[in-house]
């Protein structure tokens, strides 16, 4: 009997998603991509109905419907997310349930940019999706090419408005439905779209290549050896002998050296992103490190008390608040592994925030936290999650 082929993970991995206004064809395009690539043996064809009936997931206390499909091109392996409802998109992007390295913005040529088109572009910008490729869908339903040119111009202007390179972004025209139905010309368009995605959306930096960061979950003493801080490595790597800083909750940064590493009670040479490790810290007292701080590569992260965040506020049905809140609302902000109280200041012209809204507001924390642009947090009241957000700007 012939030996089974061994699966080699040789292709770089990229996370992408479809964004855009309702009924512009996001899910149809997702289905078409899987079908066309399946014909080349690079994917499993996913049915529109299967993608649309996305399973519920819970991410940081919030229920979100998301469909995950995967496929390959000749060059890469992709995980692609598609969310059925508009609210699911917002929640997905803000909570980071699906971290996207790039997105395909779907705009129907029959409609042009619509309110959710704008909202998804804004959110993509806020949460750090730096690369967008445009698919102008349903072009077969528009008789006049000049009208399609006009829609393309509008989309480019809208992207430029949110600091995307609107003039340079690739725009592909086609019909996702025709491709799904087997039209040869449109199948070629889908293959061309994926070539563009391959080339235009860069391969992200691997988590291991980023500066070391580990939120501290627990601290304990090993008699005769010293203090151990344990947690899950968020990014980067750490090895015995590395200098690290203990950052957060105090203005002062504590410098120390890792003198031992353990995982599953065994000693470890190198801890990588995703590993749960205990790090023995030289010359540190048990009282000097607490849950909620982070261990980090020296100089890579600072503490801040004031920031702007893009936040989704849970609706009453999702277990959130039943009433709106106003400026000076003081909930807890759960960063990394701990709650810190903060005072909210709403932007000019926003009187109050209703359950189910998404909003950008400024927060002043009562203790400094180790945060940076892109740090995720939840908003909690008495231990209950009432919102989730992303730091979009540091203000102090």
From Swiss-Prot:
- Record's keyword terms, sorted: Cytoplasm, Elongation factor, GTP-binding, Hydrolase, Magnesium, Metal-binding, Nucleotide-binding, Protein biosynthesis
Sites where the protein binds Mg(2+): 27
Q: Where is this region: G3?
A: 82-85
Q: Where in the cell is it found?
A: Cytoplasm
Q: Positions of the region G5?
A: 175-177
| Residue numbers spanned by region G1 | 20-27
The organism's place on the tree of life at top rank: Bacteria
Specify where the region named G4 lies, as residue ranges.
137-140
* Residues binding GTP, per UniProt: 20-27, 82-86, 137-140
Please give the residue ranges the record annotates as the region G2: 61-65
Q: Any idea where the tr-type G domain is?
A: 11-205
Q: Name one Pfam family in it.
A: GTP_EFTU_D2
Q: Does the keyword Nucleotidyltransferase apply?
A: no
Record-listed E.C. numbers: 3.6.5.3
A GO molecular function held by the record: GTPase activity
Its catalytic activity? GTP + H2O = GDP + phosphate + H(+)
Quaternary structure (record): Monomer.
NCBIfam families according to UniProt? EF-Tu (TIGR00485), PRK00049.1 (NF000766), PRK12735.1 (NF009372), PRK12736.1 (NF009373), small_GTP (TIGR00231)
UniProt name for this protein? Elongation factor Tu
For this protein's source organism, the top of the classification is: Bacteria, Bacillati, Bacillota, Bacilli, Lactobacillales
Q: Which gene encodes it?
A: tuf
């Amino acid at each position: 009997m012939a030996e089974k082929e061994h699966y080699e993970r040789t292709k770089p991995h990229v996370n992408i998603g479809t964004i855009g206004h309702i009924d512009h064809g996001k899910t149809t395009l997702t289905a078409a991509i899987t079908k066309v690539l399946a014909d080349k043996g690079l994917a499993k064809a996913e049915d529109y109905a299967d993608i649309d009936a996305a399973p519920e997931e819970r991410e940081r206390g919030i229920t979100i419907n998301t469909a995950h499909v995967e496929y390959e091109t000749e060059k890469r392996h992709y995980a692609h997310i598609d969310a059925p409802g508009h609210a699911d998109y917002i929640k997905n992007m803000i909570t980071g349930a699906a971290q996207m390295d790039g997105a395909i913005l779907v705009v129907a040529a029959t409609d042009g940019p619509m309110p959710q088109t704008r909202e998804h572009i804004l959110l993509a910008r806020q949460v750090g999706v730096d690369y967008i490729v445009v698919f102008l869908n349903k072009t077969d339903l528009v008789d006049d090419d000049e009208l399609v040119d006009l829609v393309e111009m509008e989309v480019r202007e809208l992207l430029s408005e949110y600091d995307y390179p609107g003039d340079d972004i690739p725009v592909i025209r086609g019909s996702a439905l025709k491709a799904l139905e087997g039209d040869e010309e449109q199948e070629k368009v889908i293959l061309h779209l994926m070539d563009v995605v391959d080339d235009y959306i860069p391969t992200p930096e691997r988590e291991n290549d980023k500066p070391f960061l580990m939120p501290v979950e627990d601290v304990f003493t090993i008699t005769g050896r010293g203090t151990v801080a344990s947690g899950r490595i968020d990014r980067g790597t750490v090895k015995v002998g590395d200098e690290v800083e203990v950052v957060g909750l105090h203005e002062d940064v504590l410098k120390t050296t890792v003198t031992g590493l353990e995982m599953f009670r065994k000693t470890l040479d190198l801890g990588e992103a995703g590993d749960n490790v205990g790090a023995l810290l030289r010359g540190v007292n048990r009282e000097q490190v607490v849950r909620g701080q982070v261990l980090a590569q020296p100089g890579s992260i600072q503490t801040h008390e004031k920031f702007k965040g893009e936040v989704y506020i849970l609706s009453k049905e999702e277990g959130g608040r039943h009433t709106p809140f106003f400026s000076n609302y003081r909930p807890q902000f759960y960063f990394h592994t701990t709650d810190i109280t903060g005072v909210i200041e709403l932007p000019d012209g926003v009187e109050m925030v209703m359950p189910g809204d998404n909003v950008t507001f400024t927060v002043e924390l009562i203790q400094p936290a180790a945060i940076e642009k892109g740090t995720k947090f939840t908003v909690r009241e008495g231990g209950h999650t009432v919102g989730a957000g992303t730091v979009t700007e540091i203000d102090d």
